[in-house]
Structures are given as structure tokens and as C-alpha cells.
């Protein structure tokens, strides 16, 4: 069965197929529009399970545990690593804290037929593909290098040094897009969102 044909299935105890939710791992360079695409997907797919990352850092003002992040103490985080309960994890800011993707909520949602979306960086996507081969990795790409530069500069939220670092990282990420199962070019939000909806649930809501 191809990715666009509908939910995958697995045999139940009585031999009848049960739907298994698709797991899509989304990655892409800074300023390519990942957050906007994620918002669109959450609006289009009401039952979408969007993976909330676990982190060892302290909550910032206004952040809600379980909504923005799962805030976990360093000892517990290490236990999750040792027990293989993270699909991927990384040290942030030179080891100042750690963050990662909890395996249990993702597998539990998929097992009940719910589509799952995970947004991570390039290294995270590669790690998840190794630990969860059935996941579909998607690289969200800009229409052109010039477009990505314009988006980064146009945000007006970073210094010139930060923008240059992000562009240097983006070159590395763009060079690796061939490692992904699918590349979606974010020319127009509606089109990019529709492609991802199709990957997650088989067809875009409202389409014939």
C-alpha cells in the first residue's frame, strides 16, 4: 500500500485489520514556514496528535507542561534514554539542557489509528527513522535559496550574525533533503498543507 492510499492496517486478535495511524516527521530549515504549516495541519485534522517534546529546562513564563513541553528533571530524562523511551534526543546549548521525543505517546496514538506529526531538526528526523522505520520523513523546502534568505531577513527578529549562522545551517539541511522520504516545497501554504494532509490521512479533507 502506498502512502497516499489510506491508513495502514495491522491484524487484530480476531484477524480483522485495524487502522494504524501514520507517523509523519517534519523537518526543514529555519524560516521555511514549519510553524505555519503545523498550525494549518492542526486546523485541518482535528484528531491529529502533535508530538510535544520533553525537555530538562525550566518552564518559561506562560509555558504549560504537556502543552508547550513535557518538563522533566535531568535524572528522569536519563532514565528515559537508558530505557529506550525516546525516539530521539539531543543536548541543547552545549549540554545546558536536553530535549527529545517521547516514544510512548507517539506509539500509543498511532496504535489507535490517530495520525501523528512530529516536528524535529535534521538529526532528530534521522534518529526517528532509525528507531521507527515506519515513520515517513518529510523535508519542507523553500521555493529557492533566495526566497529563504528573504524570509530570514524579513522576519527582523535576528541579528546579522544569527541570520548568517542560520543560513549556514540551512545549506547543510538543504543538501540532506535527499535523505528524506518526501520533499514538500512550501511555495504556497495551502498546497504544502494539502500535501501533508494527504500523507497523514490519505486525502485532503473536502477533496473528491
Swiss-Prot record:
This is Guanylate kinase. It comes from the Bacteria. Its EC number is 2.7.4.8. Residues 21-201 form the Guanylate kinase-like domain. CDD domains: GMPK. PROSITE patterns: GUANYLATE_KINASE_1 (PS00856), GUANYLATE_KINASE_2 (PS50052). Keywords: Acetylation, ATP-binding, Cytoplasm, Kinase, Nucleotide-binding, Transferase. GO terms for molecular function: adenylate kinase activity; ATP binding; GDP binding; GMP binding; guanylate kinase activity; magnesium ion binding. NCBIfam families: guanyl_kin. The modification N-acetylserine is found at residue 2. It catalyses: GMP + ATP = GDP + ADP. Pfam families: Guanylate_kin. It is an enzyme of class 2 (transferase). The gene is gmk. Its main location: cytoplasm. SMART domains: GuKc. Belongs to the guanylate kinase family. Essential for recycling GMP and indirectly, cGMP.
Amino acid at each position: 500500500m502506498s502512502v497516499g492510499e489510506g491508513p495502514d492496517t495491522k491484524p487484530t486478535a480476531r484477524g480483522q485489520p485495524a487502522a494504524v495511524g501514520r507517523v509523519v516527521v517534519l523537518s526543514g530549515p529555519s524560516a521555511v514556514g514549519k510553524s505555519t504549516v503545523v498550525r494549518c495541519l492542526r486546523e485541518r485534522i482535528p484528531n491529529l496528535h502533535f508530538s510535544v517534546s520533553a525537555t530538562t529546562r525550566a518552564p518559561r513564563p506562560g509555558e504549560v507542561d504537556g502543552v508547550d513541553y513535557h518538563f522533566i528533571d535531568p535524572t528522569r530524562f536519563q532514565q528515559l534514554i537508558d530505557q529506550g523511551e525516546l525516539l530521539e534526543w539531543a543536548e541543547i546549548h552545549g549540554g545546558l539542557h536536553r530535549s527529545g521525543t517521547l516514544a510512548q505517546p507517539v506509539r500509543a496514538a498511532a496504535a489507535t489509528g490517530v495520525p501523528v506529526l512530529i516536528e524535529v531538526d535534521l538529526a532528530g528526523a534521522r534518529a526517528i527513522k532509525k528507531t521507527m522505520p515506519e515513520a515517513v520523513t518529510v523535508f519542507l523546502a523553500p521555493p529557492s535559496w533566495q526566497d529563504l534568505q528573504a524570509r530570514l531577513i524579513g522576519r527582523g527578529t535576528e541579528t546579522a550574525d544569527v541570520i548568517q549562522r542560520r543560513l549556514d545551517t540551512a545549506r547543510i539541511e538543504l543538501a540532506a533533503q535527499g535523505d528524506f522520504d518526501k520533499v514538500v516545497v512550501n511555495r504556497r501554504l495551502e498546497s504544502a498543507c494539502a500535501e501533508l494532509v494527504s500523507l497523514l490521512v490519505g486525502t485532503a479533507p473536502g477533496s473528491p
